[in-house]
From Swiss-Prot:
One Pfam family hit: FloA
Disordered: annotated segments: 305-327
Biological role: Found in functional membrane microdomains (FMM) that may be equivalent to eukaryotic membrane rafts. FMMs are highly dynamic and increase in number as cells age. Flotillins are thought to be important factors in membrane fluidity.
HAMAP family: FloA
Stretches assigned to coiled coil: none
Subcellular location: Cell membrane; Membrane raft
Subunit annotation: Homooligomerizes.
Name of the protein in question: Flotillin-like protein FloA
Protein's UniProt keywords contain ATP-binding: no
Transmembrane portions of the chain: 2-22
NCBIfam families, sorted: PRK13665.1 (NF010186)
Length: 327
């Protein structure tokens, strides 16, 4: 009796270990769905540290949708770090939309960091990207701001390695600025905003990107400010400041030159005073040496007195002329 109890306990423990190690419920679900999966396959997944549910559940979903996938394909993608369920959903959506998307390509897109399911949905339902206001200056100096709506469709063939939405927005912005800048007058942009769309769309801006541009529509156009007039005003102000600086420089040089001339005048006056101080000494020396007689000395004094008297008369005459009113 005791031996029978031990055998029953061993069997129960074995069954418990089996059910905990092997997802029997998942295996039954797969068999019920018509997916042939062996117990050994599930055990092998456990040994390879693969969650059987994350492989078998997408496999059942794919089988029901009519996709011919294998456990090896799904397990390989799982081990590579991919999202198996999302790739299978993308394959099912692509099949329903009649889009050619092999599992290997979908797996590559998923491993590249792209949302493959969203890409398939964008291929069916295009996405609208709205740009911020982009400013450009027309030839007459008026700044014009334009906002565009870009309708794009995902290009599944270029999802791996193709540029994203930021590149599309940057290229469209560059095209808008170029088109506005080539307009002779800002009114041309206001009257025909569709010219911007046509010009930008004709440049093939979706080259090298993961999208195909379907249309570019100008949503809004605004007049900002007169950049040309502002630049002219700033240039005039700069020229004025330069002229004032040069005038101030010339004035400073003139003042410096005037002060220099005054210093030279004072220097010459000091030399004259110094020379006049030596005249009496020279006359005394001439008298002592006999080169100048007493008579000559008095004649010189008379000439000096006569010259001083004439200068005094001339000064009084000039003062009277200045004080008399003009006739």
């Amino acid at each position: 009796m005791i031996g029978l109890i031990i055998i029953v306990v061993i069997v129960l423990v074995a069954l418990l270990l089996l059910f905990s190690f092997v997802p029997v419920g998942l295996w039954i679900s797969a068999i019920a769905a018509g997916v042939k999966v062996g117990i050994g396959t599930l055990v092998g997944m456990r040994l390879r540290r693969v969650s059987p549910r994350k492989v078998i559940s997408p496999l059942i979903k794919a089988h029901k949708a009519g996709l011919h996938l294998t456990t090896n394909q799904l397990e390989s993608h799982y081990l590579a770090g991919g999202n198996v369920d999302r790739v299978v959903d993308a394959n099912i959506a692509a099949q329903r939309a009649d889009i050619n998307l092999p599992f290997e390509r979908g797996a590559a897109i998923d491993l590249a960091g792209r949302d493959v399911l969203e890409a398939v949905q964008m291929s069916v339902n295009p996405k609208v990207i709205e740009t911020p206001f982009i400013a450009g200056v027309a030839m007459n100096g008026i700044e014009v701001k334009a906002k565009a709506r870009i309708t794009v469709r995902a290009n599944i063939a270029r999802l791996v390695g193709g540029a994203g939405e930021e590149t599309i927005i940057a290229r469209v912005g560059e095209g808008i600025v170029s088109t506005i800048g080539s307009s002779e007058h800002h009114t041309q942009v206001l009257e025909n905003p569709d010219n911007i769309s046509k010009t930008v769309l004709s440049k093939g801006l979706d080259s090298g990107t993961a999208f195909e541009i379907l249309s570019i529509d100008i949503a809004d156009v605004d007049i900002s400010k007169n950049i040309g007039a502002d630049l002219q005003t700033e240039q005039a102000l700069a020229d004025k400041n330069i002229a004032q600086a040069k005038a101030e420089e010339r004035r400073a040089m003139a003042v410096a030159q005037e002060q220099e001339m005054k210093a030279k005048v004072q220097e010459m006056r000091s030399k004259v005073v110094e020379a006049e101080a030596e005249v009496p000494l020279a006359m005394a020396e001439a008298l002592r040496s006999g080169n100048l007689g007493v008579k000559d000395y008095y004649n010189l004094k008379n000439v000096e007195a006569d010259t001083g008297m004439r200068n005094s008369i001339n000064q009084r005459t000039n003062q009277k002329d200045d004080e008399s009113p003009d006739k």
